[in-house]
Amino acid sequence: MKENWVYRRGDLYLANLGVPVGSKQGGVRPVVVLQNDVGNYYAPTITIAPLTSKIEKKRKQPTHFFLRKAKGLAKPSMVLAEQLDTCDKICVIRYLGRVSKGQMRGIDEAVRIQLDYYIPEQSEKKRQGKCRKDGEEGDG
């Protein structure tokens, strides 16, 4: 049945992340799919971030994103973007729901901070004004 599922970026699933080691999240818990939909279709794995319902701890950590409500979550949860993981699709137990577009933007922001892909808004505005035209070479 899982082979017939269509995994989409922003979907929430219940997954078995295995035995936790040290501070790494494990066990059966909600996860949010971060991988692009092309990869979700073809790959036997999905890139995810685990969620926790222990929302009091390190709530202001920039790699955490608070989900007060999300379609399919029973209680408020925290996305732990510092614990990005690749999960085999056979570890996915069931579909829970989906985060909103606004929530996904917040999760993306936390992931960018975790991976140091963070572009401050000022720099991003400058970059948008200097878009290359089709056929132009970039500087890297």
Give the ranges of each region predicted by the language model:
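Conserved functional hotspots at enzyme active or ligand-binding sites that engage polyanionic ligands
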Residues: 1-140
